[in-house]
Amino acid sequence: MRINLFVNILFGTACIIIFGLVILISYKLYRYIPKRNNSNKVYKEDYPSIMARAISCLIYFLPLLEGIAQFGIVCIDDHSWIRIIYKNTLAYIVVPYLESPLIGFCIFITLYLIFVRGIIQISKFIKFHIVQALLLYLLDSVIGTVLTSLPLEIGYSFIGDRLADTLLLITFMISIYAGTDALKGQYSNIPLISEAAKMQSKSTD
């Protein structure tokens, strides 16, 4: 048991280091790529570079993974066709994420301290999408914690299963929508969450 715990901690630490290096290298490349001059400006900011859009899109894998971890197990078990797709695609990422629960939290803290709090200065566009992804991650975590704290008669009932399916679908839709907007160089417009992300981004400038 202790060996498994040590392996999970070691794996989680390695994942965090690798993720941090990917973000750091991407940021360094982003700094060296000339910004594109474009007359179409988004919120009075120069049109984001390809690297900035790619980094912003990548961040949304965090709330997506958290949503699958919190709501996806029931859905995967109930639907065979989803299980087949899952095993051939996302399982390689989700399984290690589930086995090391601290990975998501450590990535959250790392992104918040380094990029949101301003240890490394980044553009408002990237900061907005990082903050928004972190808010979505927190929302998934809180809702998932509430669901798991419900009595078994409710959590594992037909209503509980359908609620988990609905939340998973919403998580997928929001993550894909926000990631697509990031790739297009646009700011998302998710009710309440986007406004909170804008306010947090401005308050940390």
Curated annotation (Swiss-Prot):
InterPro entries referenced in this protein's UniProt entry, alphabetically: Tic20 (IPR005691)
Assigned keywords, A-Z: Chloroplast, Membrane, Plastid, Transmembrane, Transmembrane helix
Listed name of the protein: Tic20 family protein Ycf60
Membrane topology: Multi-pass membrane protein
Ranges annotated as spanning the membrane: 5-25, 54-74, 102-122, 130-150, 163-183
GO cellular component, one term: chloroplast membrane
Cysteine disulfide partners in this protein: none
Subcellular location: Plastid, Chloroplast membrane
Pfam families: TIC20
Stored PANTHER family: PROTEIN TIC 20-II, CHLOROPLASTIC (PTHR33510:SF5)
Origin: domain of life: Eukaryota
Keyword Transmembrane helix: yes
Signal peptide stretch: none
Primary location: plastid
Family of this protein: Belongs to the Tic20 family.
